[in-house]
């Protein structure tokens, strides 16, 4: 009984500390890339449900990895650091960098979100994704 209680307490503190660490990561990334924390959290929520182990195999032969679902199309640019994507904080930072590039390149959050999702700024083609992220942002 005592072991079970200690185990439960340990798991609780692990989950709380992980949540705090991820919160810090989102804050740091938002500050670095001048993006709203709520938007970054909404992307993570939409992409993986904040699951650092999430892997999604796309139909085009690529896959998405981690909290922010970083696609393997970025492998060449991130090759020396690719294994770091398993670190949720690093994954959030890289996802924020990609979103920042998209927003800066195409001018605007909606086009940036479309670009983040598909590589194209066409909001109409990615309307469901864009509005799903924006709806999720209200939670944060």
Give short role names for the model-derived ranges.
Residues 1-2:
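N-terminal secretory signal peptides that target proteins for export/translocation
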Residues 5-15:
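Sec-dependent N-terminal signal peptides
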Residues 21-140:
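Catalytic glycan-binding domains that act on GlcNAc-containing polysaccharides
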């Amino acid at each position: 009984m005592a072991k079970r209680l200690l185990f439960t307490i340990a798991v609780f503190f692990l989950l709380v500390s992980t949540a705090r660490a991820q919160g810090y990561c989102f804050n740091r990334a938002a500050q670095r890339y001048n993006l709203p924390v709520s938007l970054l959290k909404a992307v993570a929520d939409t992409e993986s449900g904040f699951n650092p182990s999430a892997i999604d195999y796309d139909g085009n032969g690529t896959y998405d990895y981690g909290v922010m679902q970083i696609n393997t199309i970025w492998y060449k640019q991130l090759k020396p650091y690719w294994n770091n994507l398993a670190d949720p904080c690093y994954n959030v930072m890289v996802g924020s960098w990609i979103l920042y590039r998209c927003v800066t390149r195409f001018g605007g959050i909606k086009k940036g979100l479309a670009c983040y999702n598909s590589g194209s700024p066409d909001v109409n083609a990615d309307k469901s994704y864009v509005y799903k992220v924006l709806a999720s942002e209200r939670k944060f």
